[in-house]
Regions:
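Post-signal-peptide N-terminal segment of Sec-exported extracytoplasmic proteins
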Residues: 35-78
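Bacterial signal peptide processing site
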Residues: 18-21
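Non-transmembrane domains of secretory- and envelope-associated proteins
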Residues: 132-188
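Short, solvent-exposed coil/turn segments at beta-strand boundaries
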Residues: 32-35, 59-66, 83-88, 133-142, ...
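C-terminal motif of bacterial Sec signal peptides marking the signal peptidase cleavage site
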Residues: 13-16
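An acidic-aromatic
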Residues: 65-115
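N-terminal helix-cap/turn-to-beta initiation motif at the start of protein domains
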Residues: 23-36, 112
Length: 188
């Protein structure tokens, strides 16, 4: 489960790094909503073959935040949450009661130069459009070593919803960003 949580962080944070290789050929006026939700399926290859999949949800309020919740199969209880804002990232491991909070500046050394919140928003909004790319691989977002990992987005909605910043109780302990980096390096 820890591998899933940390892989999701990498996939989400680096999703803004995907290069755009297609030109807009349509001149249709598409109204973009300030709100977007979808279900998601994260599939991670196993080290010894096979793969592991976990479902979840994605909520986005344009120019404000993206929240991704990974849900335990069958019980549908949240096991992890990733919250991305223009200023930073919060990763919450609900199973082990710990979290990492990193600012954009702290993440600069880990991320490609063009990793921006606005790029993540664009990828998610584009996926919600008819004919949009709804399955993203590690290669698509600039991480060739995670080529077989996939995030599938589906059942999009642009209905308005309420979303508040994630608040954590004293039961959760903060772990340093370096601990997260070590875990990611071991995983990759």
């Amino acid at each position: 489960m820890k591998r899933i949580v940390f892989l999701l962080l990498v996939v989400v944070v680096l999703a803004g790094c995907k290069s755009s290789k297609h030109l807009a050929t349509s001149e249709k006026n598409v109204q973009v909503s300030s709100y977007l939700t979808s279900k998601l399926q994260l599939t991670i290859p196993g080290k010894k073959g096979g793969s592991m999949a976990v479902g979840g949800t994605m909520k986005m309020k344009t120019h404000e935040r993206v929240q991704i919740s990974l849900l335990m199969p069958i019980l549908r209880t949240e096991v992890a949450r990733v919250e991305v804002t223009p200023d930073g990232v919060l990763l919450v491991d609900r199973m082990n009661k710990r979290f990492v909070r990193a600012t954009k500046d702290e993440l600069k050394g880990m991320l490609p130069k063009n990793a921006e919140f606005s790029r993540l928003e664009k990828i998610l909004l584009d996926a919600s459009l008819p004919g949009g790319k709804t399955e993203l691989s590690g290669k698509d977002i600039g991480i060739p070593s995670l080529e077989k990992a996939k995030v599938q987005l589906y059942e999009f909605s642009t209905k308005e919803f309420s979303m508040t910043p994630t608040e954590l109780t004293s039961k959760y302990r903060q772990v340093p960003l370096e601990e997260l980096v070590k875990m990611l390096v071991a995983f990759l």
